[in-house]
Amino acid sequence: INDFIKNNYPSISKGQMLDFKYPQNFKGWDDKYEQLLQYEGFARALISTRKNHINLDLENKFINDSNIPLYTIWGDSDSAVVYNNFKNKLNKLMPRRIEYFISNSGHLPNMENSVEFEDILYNKILKEN
């Protein structure tokens, strides 16, 4: 844990800014994240997340094969989870999904373009269901 903290904590908060297409619009986001680093157990949680990242292909296929409405929402400029790296897999596992791409947003489209995100969520997804 100490090695993880030593090697990652100095830059991890600034790295959070890469989730945004326009990080200049979220001044202080890295400072908020920095506060999390003070909590005992936070490093352990990050390590656990990295170590226990599991393949959810079976679960995703199960959801696709069910009657559950299925949507994916992407920021059009997401550099954390790049759509083009996953689209073939998504097409295979979840071909019936309805996709939405939020303009002018990165990994956190609900924050960067909340108007468009909320319009899709409330006026399309939730209205259909």
Each model region followed by its residue ranges:
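Conserved alpha/beta-hydrolase catalytic His-Asp/Glu region
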Residues: 3-64
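A general structural signal for short secondary-structure boundary/capping elements
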Residues: 18-21, 79-83, 116-117, 121
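Conserved short-loop catalytic and cofactor-binding motifs
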Residues: 30, 34, 74, 105
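Conserved serine/cysteine hydrolase catalytic core
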Residues: 42-91, 101
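Catalytic active-site module of serine/aspartate enzymes centered on a nucleophile-bearing elbow/loop
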Residues: 95-129
